[in-house]
């Protein structure tokens, strides 16, 4: 059986997103100690990291607005559509990135990471399903998972049974729980956040130039 790796390539532009290095897997005491120190410092430096990310992101989007020939230009109208539903937000690659940044600021980025991992899993070739299912389960669903998602006991146990004979839909139940959690909890706050409103205001202002 070929080894399978979970891939969410577009999100790797965001700091610390999907499947960042696990200190326990690093070789050598020096690396482990260094990584432990970085983890302890994260709460102090995260705000600065987020601001730096947004500062680098906004000019890029603004410069894209000026090129009418580009088919991938992000418009203010498109960003406004994100407020219509979580479904529309997640259907847009930049929307995924911006929402992921917001979730990271709330230390709940595991929700979108799991949701995206499930979307990727559904497209997996059948012979790779067992490997990938185990990786997703260990990363997000297992009770000792480093990025454990907030699902009820029954859903967790049901998912554990399903991955023993994995199918493309074995994570659907857990994915639905997490989607509903984001939709009712994080998504409304995102629409009122500086991350979203500043991006929208910048694009609207730029469109008037």
From Swiss-Prot:
Gene3D superfamilies from the UniProt entry: 1.10.196.10, Regulator of G-protein Signalling 4, domain 2
Record's note on what induces expression: In response to several B-cell activation signals.
Tissue: Detected in peripheral blood monocytes. Expression is relatively low in B-cells and chronic lymphocytic leukemia B-cells; however, in other types of malignant B-cell such as non-Hodgkin lymphoma and hairy cell leukemia, expression is constitutively high.
GO MF terms held by the record: calmodulin binding; G-protein alpha-subunit binding; GTPase activator activity; GTPase activity
Membrane-related topology note: Peripheral membrane protein
Keyword Membrane in record: yes
Location of this chain's protein in the cell: Cell membrane; Cytoplasm, Cytosol
Superkingdom: Eukaryota
Keywords: Cell membrane, Cytoplasm, GTPase activation, Membrane, Signal transduction inhibitor
Keyword Membrane: yes
GO biological processes: adenylate cyclase-inhibiting G protein-coupled receptor signaling pathway; G protein-coupled receptor signaling pathway; immune response; leukotriene signaling pathway; negative regulation of signal transduction; positive regulation of GTPase activity; response to bacterium; signal transduction
Main location: membrane
One cellular component term from this protein's GO annotations in UniProt: cytosol
RGS domain sequence ranges: 85-200
Function, in words: Regulates G protein-coupled receptor signaling cascades, including signaling downstream of the N-formylpeptide chemoattractant receptors and leukotriene receptors. Inhibits B cell chemotaxis toward CXCL12. Inhibits signal transduction by increasing the GTPase activity of G protein alpha subunits thereby driving them into their inactive GDP-bound form.
Subunit and interaction comment: Interacts with GNAI1 and GNAQ.
Xref: PANTHER family: REGULATOR OF G PROTEIN SIGNALING, REGULATOR OF G-PROTEIN SIGNALING 1
Name of the molecule in the record: Regulator of G-protein signaling 1
Species in which this protein is naturally found: Homo sapiens
Gene it is expressed from: RGS1
């Amino acid at each position: 059986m070929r080894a399978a790796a979970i891939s969410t390539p577009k999100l790797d532009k965001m700091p610390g997103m999907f499947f960042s290095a696990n200190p326990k897997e690093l070789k050598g005491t020096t690396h482990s100690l260094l990584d432990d120190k970085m983890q302890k410092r994260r709460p102090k430096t995260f705000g600065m990291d987020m601001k730096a990310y947004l500062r680098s992101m906004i000019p890029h989007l603004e410069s894209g607005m000026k090129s009418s020939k580009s088919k991938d230009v992000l418009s203010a109208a498109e960003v406004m559509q994100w407020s219509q539903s979580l479904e529309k937000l997640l259907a847009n690659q930049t929307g995924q990135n911006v929402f992921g940044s917001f979730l990271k600021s709330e230390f709940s980025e595991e929700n979108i990471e799991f949701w995206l991992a499930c979307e990727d899993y559904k497209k997996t070739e059948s012979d790779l399903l067992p490997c990938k299912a185990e990786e997703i389960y260990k990363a997000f669903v297992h009770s000792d998972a480093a990025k454990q998602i907030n699902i009820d006991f029954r859903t967790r146990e049901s998912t554990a049974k399903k991955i023993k004979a994995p199918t493309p839909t074995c994570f659907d139940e857990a994915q639905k729980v997490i989607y509903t959690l984001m939709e009712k909890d994080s998504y409304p706050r995102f629409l009122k956040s500086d991350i979203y409103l500043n991006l929208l205001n910048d694009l609207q202002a730029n469109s008037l130039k």
